[in-house]
Amino acid sequence: MSEMLKKARAYEAEKAAQTDKNTRPLFHISAPAGWINDPNGFSIYDGKIHLFYQYYPYAREWGPMHWGHSVTTDMISWEQLPAALAPDQDYDRNGCFSGSAIEADNKHVLVYTGVTKITLPDGREEERQNQCIAFGDGRDYVKYENNPVVTGEMLPENCSRIDFRDPKIWKEEDTYYLIVGSKDNRQIGQVVLCSSKDLKEWKFETVLAANSTGKVGTMWECPDFFPLEDKHVLICSPQNMKAEKYEFHNGNNSVYFLGNYDKNSHIFEKEEPHTIDYGLDFYAPQTTLLPDGRRVMIAWMKSWDACVVPDTQDWQGMMTLPRELEVKDGQIWQQPVREIAQYHKNPCHYEHAEIDGETALSGICGRTMDLTVTMDEQDFNVFSIQLAADEEYETSFTYHKGTGILEIDRTYCGVTRDVVCVRKIKIADPKGLKKMRFILDRQSIELFINDGQQVATTAVCTPLEAEGIRFFSDKKMYITVEKYDIVL
């Protein structure tokens, strides 16, 4: 083990001992120290679910990337393990960027992007991003002596050697495949496909998909590719993507394409892109396939352009709650992993509760909960819910029935930076908003709309004492409310 990795492990252990766990997210992965971003290596090994992530332990801002590591059996209660990778080799000295993991020959294999710099003939330095592997036992990992195993020199000449990152690996029959985010010399985002029989010798296959319309960003980060029911799904996170009405608002977006994939020719016929998450804080999702057949997705619960953390907090970055995916009506629908029900406590239920003006319901309060609100077709114009609320703070979700717009507003959640606080969502169901399921943790709100047809993720930095929930309607209406505290 390198001295750099030993140092990171010692530092994170020291910081963990100093951290008040009662102020951290209860059931979401958060930075053990410093900073985390993209989820990496979401995989099954030795009977456990592993998640790694981009990690800089020494400051709450982005720095030379390490890989942090957590493990779970149920995706709700997570155990922090020591850091897995540090940028300690010549080929990754500028960072161990994002990647994935797979079990092979009883080893846990990490595939990641090693970042380094080369000196050009004219004396200028230029970055290079190449794909590397490491072999481990679920806790400690050894980098392959002949890294990198996939380099930009293997790609067509018009593909960038600088922006070539975030490999996602899988196996079909006797062949390993990986896709890698890329762009060409016209600044067109794309993903490339490579293959190997032994994980060590790789070859370029094809450009699997590209921004053929010119509307889907300049660089496709963190790609994922998998079958889901009778379709294949390509997920990526395009940079510099322009908004289209109520879609693709984050600049750094995450989108998915459904399509048909020919495994022999490696041709993917993709459909139009769709937004994965309509909220303010969601990027770089990655999926894994559980032993029971569920395809589950997790993402970084943050935006590159936002800093929604308390000023006194010395760490930054969380992951979303893992979500189950399914294809329905030509779209991906998402649900919180069903394991969350194992942690339901203190139920509180209202059937046909009257809302007229601002209303509070006894027993409906708290900051770590699973809250579902259902409404039938009724005569109102505006309906709103304020969460994590008191006299000073609130995060509101306001539905304007006439336009079918749901507005999220965290302006008063405690944020002290000039960040985006409002997002408007056009409800996809032509019948309008019927059900909202909120998953609240201490620093986040995840909203599942109409049984997961749309999802919106929002980070908040509200003092934990603000635990009120308020309802409002401009006309008398009735709702059904079901609340469970989440208790670990």
Predicted regions and their residues:
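Beta-rich carbohydrate-recognition and catalytic domains
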Residues: 1-166, 171-216, 227-278, 301-352, ...
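Beta-rich accessory regions
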Residues: 9-15, 252-488
